[in-house]
Amino acid sequence: MQKLMAMGALCAALATAAQAETLALDGIGNSRDVRCKGQDVAITGNANRFRLSGDCGRVEVHGSDQVVTVDNVANLEVTGGENQIEAERVGSLDVSGADHRITAQVQGDGEQPASVVLYGGSNILTLDLHGPVHLEVNGIGQQVTWRGDDPTVETSGGEHRIQRRQPCAGWRFDWNVIRCA
């Protein structure tokens, strides 16, 4: 009986470990729809198009010319250059590299402020801020526009443009989501 219980515990532990593994999406010019199911996701390569649906843990986007849309992600990290990311909801956002275009709704977990950290140069972030958010902008020539709650802002480097977006003039339909134009 003890051997049977030990075997059951081992199987449960292996199933949990398999579920906790990071899902790796890589290549050049690939296109794919993926359900996160709470998993962490690592995206690498060049010119891929990935749609991540559901709740994701940590999502890392490395490389260049990636186009990624994601529903809900706890932590989003973007490195490399010229990636385009659209996230319906992120808990924290960490960006480094250059010439990224990122659109996201940033919302903390209610216990701590959400965090947005930006390094590199010439990145463009368009953010909807909900609840307390700490925004740290470093590097050169970063552009951050937001609407919603005012963030606490910390800067270093230069030639940044950090400003509140004006109210909606109209609406647009993009990636099956209605957005302010």
What do these predicted ranges mean?
Residues 2-9:
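Sec-dependent signal peptide recognition
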Residues 10-20:
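Hydrophobic h-region of N-terminal signal peptides that target proteins for export
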Residues 18-181:
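Extended beta-solenoid/beta-helix repeat architectures
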